[in-house]
Amino acid sequence: MAAKLRKGDKVVVLAGRDKGKEGTIASVDPKAGKAVVDGVNMAIRHTRQTQTSQGGRLPKALPIDLSNLALLDSNGKATRVGFREEDGKKVRFAKTTGETV
């Protein structure tokens, strides 16, 4: 199946402790059905000090399930994504506004 959410998409979290937060997708893992969203699902990772890095407690964005994310349309509202053909190419569009993504 084609990817409805891709890297660089602006999304909103639908469920979980970060419900309502918005962010941009940094990476997508289609096999696992998860995506890393900037500023969402953050966890503290402890790193040891080395010659090159300071070390300490660093925040890291963890993967979140794709089913808990929704694309934001041009109005800033959560929308579902559909597919249609334009000029012989398969394109994604927002179901709320009908605009191509």
UniProtKB/Swiss-Prot annotation:
Entry keyword annotation includes RNA-binding: yes
Pfam families: KOW (PF00467), ribosomal_L24 (PF17136)
The keyword ATP-binding is assigned to this record: no
Entry GO terms, CC: ribonucleoprotein complex; ribosome
InterPro entries noted in UniProt: KOW, Rib_uL2_dom2, Ribosomal_uL24, Ribosomal_uL24_CS, Ribosomal_uL24_KOW, Translation_prot_SH3-like_sf
PROSITE patterns recorded: RIBOSOMAL_L24 (PS01108)
Keywords: Ribonucleoprotein, Ribosomal protein, RNA-binding, rRNA-binding
Superkingdom field: Bacteria
Stretch forming the signal peptide: none
One annotated GO molecular function: rRNA binding
GO biological process: translation
Function, in words: One of two assembly initiator proteins, it binds directly to the 5'-end of the 23S rRNA, where it nucleates assembly of the 50S subunit. One of the proteins that surrounds the polypeptide exit tunnel on the outside of the subunit.
The protein's assembly and partners: Part of the 50S ribosomal subunit.
NCBIfam families per UniProt: rplX_bact
Entry's family note: Belongs to the universal ribosomal protein uL24 family.
Name used for this protein in its record: Large ribosomal subunit protein uL24
The organism of origin for this protein: Ruegeria sp. (strain TM1040) (Silicibacter sp.)
GN (gene name): rplX
